[in-house]
Amino acid sequence: MRLLIAIAASAVVLLAAGCSASSSHPAASPSPLPPDPHTAAALLTIARAFNHDYDTGDYGPVYERWDARSQAIITRADYIKRHKDCPSGSQTLSRTESASLGGPHGAWLAQYAIGGQQLTDYWFYVHRRWVFDLVLSNPAAVKLYRMSPSQFVAALGCAH
């Protein structure tokens, strides 16, 4: 009887070891993105692409430009899902007009207009990349993204 138990135990150990061994290769880590130039011209180009992506519903690249504090508010998947399920904003494309240093805590300001309304986004240069600060740029959106999905839909008045 002890021999049967020992054989069974050995078989379990061998099976467990076989199941846990990985025959696949580890995923290659993505190549790091090239650094962004630390210039007003580079920020203006990036802010224009950022606003165009948002205006046209390409939300992934928008989220990727958010700073860490902003990304901590909502996951990328939830951000994209909410905007796909409940599109917000104007049907008019924005026009990004300028970028300059001059905001709080060293922020750079990207000035843009939507349908004649002048707006400002706050950007920082972090680890050789331009990142968007949602908290400074759009505090009202922060409140919306902290809501549950059903509260978000109700607050924006979308049919869901």
What is each residue range found by the language model?
Residues 1-8:
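Bacterial N-terminal signal peptides that target proteins for export
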Residues 20-22:
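Bacterial signal peptide processing site
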Residues 37-38, 44-49, 56-107:
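Short solvent-exposed beta->alpha transition segments
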